[in-house]
């Protein structure tokens, strides 16, 4: 069950991530590279280099949970990068738009519209 809410803090890892990584490696990246504690209940987002795949890691009461989304076509558009804090400004709304495909490059939207028109 998708149990993420707007009350949680969201952190997008600022470098491309190998999507073969799983619970332990991603947890290590959060601790060692992001300086955060995975058990705080915050949500951590990882995206691969071509921006076609996303993993979301967070801690629930029963343990760690990973959500993995892979786009059939197009790519995720990253939120605005904040140079003062060296992080991406990420919120619940940004994540939902990314997952639902609303926050995507204009070229991708055109490709999707063209595919829809051709399939009719």
Language-model-derived ranges and their functions:
Residues 1-120:
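Polybasic/polar functional segments that serve as interface/processing modules
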């Amino acid at each position: 069950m998708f149990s993420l809410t707007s009350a949680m803090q969201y952190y997008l890892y600022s470098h491309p991530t190998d999507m073969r990584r799983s619970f332990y490696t991603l947890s290590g990246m959060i601790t060692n590279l992001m300086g955060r504690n995975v058990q705080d209940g915050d949500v951590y987002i990882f995206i691969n280099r071509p921006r076609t795949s996303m993993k979301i890691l967070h801690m629930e009461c029963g343990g760690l949970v990973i959500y993995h989304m892979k786009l059939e076509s197009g790519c995720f558009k990253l939120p605005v990068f904040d140079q003062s804090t060296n992080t991406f400004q990420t919120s619940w709304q940004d994540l939902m738009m990314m997952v639902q495909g609303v926050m995507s490059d204009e070229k991708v939207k055109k490709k999707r519209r063209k595919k829809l028109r051709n399939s009719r």
